[in-house]
């Protein structure tokens, strides 16, 4: 099992009712125990992860402490903060496991920038809510300072800022990530979908956006020529007609059939559909590519073919 694998961790890997650092580290410790058999295998491993709750907390902290002396940091910088924070937690727990196994593998985090197209039409239709809730009066004041920002009412709970979710075009650090992964290193990258940047003259500039982590993980897997993209979520298998009387579990499926189901609206938008779309793109990116969708607990069993949904040409 010497294949190269990108493991896209779902938010449930760090999910906890408590928002303290200690509670989140405990959740990560439990999560990484499920991946221990993979760390003990010859597989070359890159791990991506979500950051929704963590960046949400960071943005609230920024808003509450914003002043002339402690100005709030922008979204792209908060994304970098969350990558470092979660990467540190993951490194700590993975290193603990590697030490217990007397492994000579190492683990490290790459703060990852993801290039997006400044002309992506998704910039004209911001949909991703971020940060704290505001009253209507607070929004009116904020828009005097941020005339280009968009705020939307959120299910009667107040108003939230919404930002675009452009498609990833490239992963700027992909060559470095590939070099590290092709050694004995376990690499943590593309946290929270990566930091969105646009090309500007001879450099890159951060933009206020959120990249879907499944799309970013697919782009990373393609660029580093991974063999397998494993998307870990909160269900053991993909289902068509999920949570309906006629739901049907999928164990093994080809891309052509998967496309047909997606076109028929068999997968929920905003939850399973992006994972399906990312899976299709990756499988079609080269020969003998496969995608596994399952939950964290079944990750190793899915990798050896016993569990999960397996997607291929």
Curated annotation (Swiss-Prot):
The keyword Glycoprotein does not apply. GO terms for cellular component: cytosol. It catalyses: hydrogencarbonate + NH4(+) + ATP = carbamoyl phosphate + ADP + H2O + H(+). GO terms for molecular function: ATP binding; carbamate kinase activity. GO terms for biological process: arginine deiminase pathway. InterPro entries: AceGlu_kinase-like_sf, Asp/Glu/Uridylate_kinase, Carb_kinase. Keywords: Arginine metabolism, ATP-binding, Cytoplasm, Kinase, Nucleotide-binding, Transferase. Pathway: Metabolic intermediate metabolism; carbamoyl phosphate degradation; CO(2) and NH(3) from carbamoyl phosphate: step 1/1. It comes from the Bacteria. Signal peptide: none annotated. It is found in: Cytoplasm. The keyword Endoplasmic reticulum does not apply. It holds the Pfam family AA_kinase. It is an enzyme of class 2 (transferase). Its EC number is 2.7.2.2. Its main location: cytoplasm. CDD domains: AAK_CK. Belongs to the carbamate kinase family. This is Carbamate kinase 2.
